């Protein structure tokens, strides 16, 4: 009887630890992805001279294959 109780408690403890670890790893992975995305955006070598799709075209022209749609100050680069 005591052995059965100890085994049940041990299994519950292991299950809780496993679930807790799984939850922590997904949060860290999402955070890591956001951090990597921000680092890529801020990388000095990645400065573009043209706007990509969905970006504003008030301060710089749209990239090749895109045109400025909407009013010039508030327009967005869209595919032709």
Curated annotation (Swiss-Prot):
Domain of life: Eukaryota
Coiled coil: none
Pfam families given in the database record: Conotoxin
Signal peptide start-end: 1-21
Keywords: Cleavage on pair of basic residues, Disulfide bond, Knottin, Neurotoxin, Secreted, Signal, Toxin
Cell compartments where the protein resides: Secreted
Assigned GO CC terms: extracellular region
GO molecular function: ion channel inhibitor activity; toxin activity
Tissue-wise expression: Expressed by the venom duct.
Residues of the propeptide: 22-48
Disulfide bonds: 50-63, 57-68, 62-77
Family the entry assigns: Belongs to the conotoxin O1 superfamily.
Domain-level remarks: The presence of a 'disulfide through disulfide knot' structurally defines this protein as a knottin. The cysteine framework is VI/VII (C-C-CC-C-C).
Protein name: Conotoxin ArMKLT2-0321
Organism taxonomic ancestry: Eukaryota, Metazoa, Spiralia, Lophotrochozoa, Mollusca
